[in-house]
Amino acid sequence: MALTYVFRSIRTEFSKVCTVHHAQSLHTGFPTLAAEKALLMKLRKSTGYTFINCKKALEKCDNDITKAESWLHEQAQKEGWSKASKLEGRRAKEGLIGLFVGDKAAVMVEVNCETDFVARNEKFQQLVKDVAFATMAHHSSKNQGQTGYVKSLLAAEDLSKLNLGEDASLADQLALTIGRLGENISVRRAVTVGVPAGWHIGSYIHGGVAGQSDMAMGRYGALVVFQGGKDGALDTLGRKLGQHVVGEAPVSLGNMDDLPCGDAETRLLPQSFLPDPSRTVAQYLTEQGARVLDFVRFQCGEAGSDGAH
């Protein structure tokens, strides 16, 4: 009886010790798990990569979130370049025209993808912005101190050499986006214009993307360089001229005294003015005291054209 009592007492005390130890282990483990989950959520939010890849990155980098983010970008870039080479031959005729007008300078770009679904994706639209602002930065750097009119057309090869920052190239960003979206994407062309004092830049985008505040995007775009116009009405004049160029698709400028050739007219100035077909573009400009000097029109996916005339 005495021995039985002793064994029971030992067993009871041992159970208490195990229970306390287990509870302490759980208590000390909770903060660690919570911290790891918080890191995982933060990395997922900042990069947009899957939870599985984010978890793998944190494990490889000993929960160093900065190193994990760099590792994820490196892997995505490698996968993007690989996927880009595989998708290169696929037809990409959808996409967006991006247009930004700054102080005496403007840029218009075309970025193509395979489907309208991807064109509506935020990551694709961010790429359009990256291309436009990189092109504008290139224009500003190249034309410092320029006092006259400057116009530059950039093809895909020129654009691929541009940088987004000190450590990022446009070509790498393109590969990264292809890897994320899984479609063939191409940065097709861009145009920049810079104007001197007294000149103005009108613009218009058709089929616009909602929710864009820092630049305009759509299926069609136009830039119009003009002089003159009435004070307080320059923005309206520029927008109407851009709207006409998008809608009527002129291929050359023409002269103010050219006679119109009807519906087949391809010269801008003798065309019937789209917002008011009762007069020609030349007649409208005369009434406004203005003169068009140049224009560029982009249509997303159009064949064999750089938009110049």
UniProtKB/Swiss-Prot annotation:
Compartments, as annotated in UniProt: Mitochondrion
CDD domains: UBA_EF-Ts
GO CC annotation terms, alphabetical: mitochondrion
GO terms, molecular function: translation elongation factor activity
Keywords annotated in UniProt: Elongation factor, Mitochondrion, Protein biosynthesis
Top-level lineage group: Eukaryota
Family affiliation: Belongs to the EF-Ts family.
PANTHER family assigned: ELONGATION FACTOR TS, ELONGATION FACTOR TS, MITOCHONDRIAL
Note from the entry: This protein may be expected to contain an N-terminal transit peptide but none has been predicted.
HAMAP family reported in the protein's UniProt record: EF_Ts
UniProt name for this protein: Elongation factor Ts, mitochondrial
Organism encoding this protein: Salmo salar (Atlantic salmon)
Lineage, broadest ranks: Eukaryota, Metazoa, Chordata, Craniata, Vertebrata
